[in-house]
């Protein structure tokens, strides 16, 4: 547990730092610096992009963690990573072409209500591709037990950049109409940085050759694609559905409540960045005793931490909502129910 404890602690610090900066953005800067409609637009676009990226990654971000340590030959490892690099490009191109062909129908979908989304709807697919590539490169680094920098990029980088962007908007150095485009550039820059880092950790010789276990990889990736979409859908589909049934300004009301409850998930997220690659390694090397010990320790530790955080949030929920503009309040029950779900996620430990 030495490597797990060390990197989990560093990831926990960076993740909570990221959540703190995110809380500043979500609870204070967004509500006060953006209109409720534009805040809803930002929440909707990012949530919609999150629904697409599991299809674009096609499960390969998890397949890297699961199978990389199983390959013994450099040629197999390089070919495997090469496939992982081109998969988001292929799937993103297919989805992008389909979106282009259906673009008029997409615009018509937003014509009756929420017309504010129309000029920015095309950004959903590129943002999805960027998220997919980020996860692939991050998994790339994690299999070499280099999770700390990637976690900084995942949790802190874009949130700090968004804080700066909101400051520029407040001082009218950028126009509100261009805010979304600058936001997309932040996600592009994040992918470039993590991509350079991953290639510095290990730079494969690009080659595409049929892997001896390609059927197993494809079946696992397909399963992860489905599981990954369900996991993301549980977090973001509701925000997209709210846009469908209600005006877009209702999206951030729900989004704020979800964000408050999501703080409870930070411990398990931090531990999984390093524990998941170790789990795959133990499975591949048939070290079942060590795997069982890892599961038990992670479950007990995460339950204690997450339970404490849940109680802390519930006991101070009135004070938290007091700092938010009145029109964004009203998600008390959402915080409680989603918070309980996050505690259960932590209880499952690394096995979840």
Regions found by a protein language model. Name each.
Residues 6-18, 45, 54-104, 119-122, ...:
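Membrane-water interface segments that mark the loop-to-transmembrane alpha-helix transition
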Residues 46-54, 231, 254-273, 305-309, ...:
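Transmembrane helix-bundle signature of multi-pass secondary active exporters and lipid flippases
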Residues 57-72, 143, 257, 261-299, ...:
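Helix-loop junctions and terminal segments of transmembrane helices
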Residues 105-124, 248, 313-345, 349:
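Interfacial segments at transmembrane-helix termini and the short loops linking adjacent helices
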């Amino acid at each position: 547990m030495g490597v797990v404890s060390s990197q989990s602690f560093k990831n926990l610090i960076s993740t909570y730092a990221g959540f703190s900066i995110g809380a500043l953005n979500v609870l204070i800067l967004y509500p006060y610096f953006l209109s409720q409609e534009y805040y809803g637009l930002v929440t909707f676009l990012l949530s919609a992009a999150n629904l697409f990226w599991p299809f674009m990654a096609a499960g390969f971000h998890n397949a890297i963690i699961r199978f990389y340590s199983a390959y013994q030959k450099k040629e197999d490892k390089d070919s495997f990573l090469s496939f992982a690099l081109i998969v988001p490009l292929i799937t993103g191109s297919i989805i992008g072409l389909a979106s282009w062909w259906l673009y008029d129908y997409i615009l018509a979908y937003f014509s009756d209500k929420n017309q504010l989304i129309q000029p920015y709807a095309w950004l959903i697919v590129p943002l999805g591709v960027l998220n997919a590539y980020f996860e692939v490169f991050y998994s790339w680094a994690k299999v070499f037990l280099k999770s700390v920098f990637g976690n900084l990029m995942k949790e802190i980088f874009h949130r700090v950049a968004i804080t700066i962007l909101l400051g520029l908007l407040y001082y009218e150095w950028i126009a509100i109409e261009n805010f979304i485009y600058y936001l997309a550039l932040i996600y592009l820059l994040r992918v470039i940085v993590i991509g350079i880092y991953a290639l510095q950790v290990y730079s494969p010789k690009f080659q595409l050759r049929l892997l001896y276990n390609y059927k197993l990889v494809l079946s696992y990736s397909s399963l992860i694609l489905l599981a990954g979409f369900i996991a993301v859908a549980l977090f973001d589909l509701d925000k997209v559905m709210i846009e469908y049934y209600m005006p877009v300004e209702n999206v951030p009301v729900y989004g704020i409540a979800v964000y408050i409850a999501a703080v409870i998930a930070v411990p398990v997220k931090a531990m999984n960045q390093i524990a998941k690659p170790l789990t795959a390694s133990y499975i591949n090397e048939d070290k079942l005793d060590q795997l069982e010990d890892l599961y038990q320790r992670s479950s007990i530790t995460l339950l204690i931490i997450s339970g404490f955080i849940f109680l802390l949030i519930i006991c101070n929920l009135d004070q938290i909502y007091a700092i938010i503009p009145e029109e964004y309040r009203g998600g008390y029950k959402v915080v409680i129910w989603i918070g309980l779900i996050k505690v259960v996620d932590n209880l499952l430990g690394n096995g979840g």
